[in-house]
């Protein structure tokens, strides 16, 4: 009185499809949260967003999306270290909290791999976050 092979195959397919759907939903929710957090920081318009950060979101020929997000996470991670947090961000704890949340969310989407952020060019945090928002929106639309 066991399962027929056909029924077992159908049940296995349903299980796999359900798992893929759930993972896709989690990923989409994560992307929406990241975009929402980026919007929150960009709307605040504090002087803190005029600070300079490495311009790591410049895509070159060999740059993958995963590589860009790895470098973006490295830039955002610097806001975790108290000695690297500027006085402006210390006085705007809401912005600092969102930047830390962004770092966690992005690193959850793409677990950390080894990447370098040594770039001679700088950009404002505001421009960096705006470009990061564009990348996240493209990922969200591509599904």
UniProtKB/Swiss-Prot annotation:
GO terms for cellular component: extracellular space. Disulfide bonds join 48-88, 70-115. GO terms for molecular function: cytokine activity; growth factor activity; interleukin-4 receptor binding. Its main location: secreted. Glycans are attached at residues 62, 91. One of its GO terms (biological process) is negative regulation of inflammatory response. It is found in: Secreted. The keyword Secreted applies. InterPro entries: 4_helix_cytokine-like_core, IL-4, IL-4/IL-13, IL-4/IL-13_CS. It comes from the Eukaryota. Residues 1-19 form the signal peptide. Keywords: B-cell activation, Cytokine, Disulfide bond, Glycoprotein, Growth factor, Secreted, Signal. Belongs to the IL-4/IL-13 family. Participates in at least several B-cell activation processes as well as of other cell types. It is a costimulator of DNA-synthesis. It induces the expression of class II MHC molecules on resting B-cells. It enhances both secretion and cell surface expression of IgE and IgG1. It also regulates the expression of the low affinity Fc receptor for IgE (CD23) on both lymphocytes and monocytes. Positively regulates IL31RA expression in macrophages. Stimulates autophagy in dendritic cells by interfering with mTORC1 signaling and through the induction of RUFY4. This is Interleukin-4. The gene is IL4.
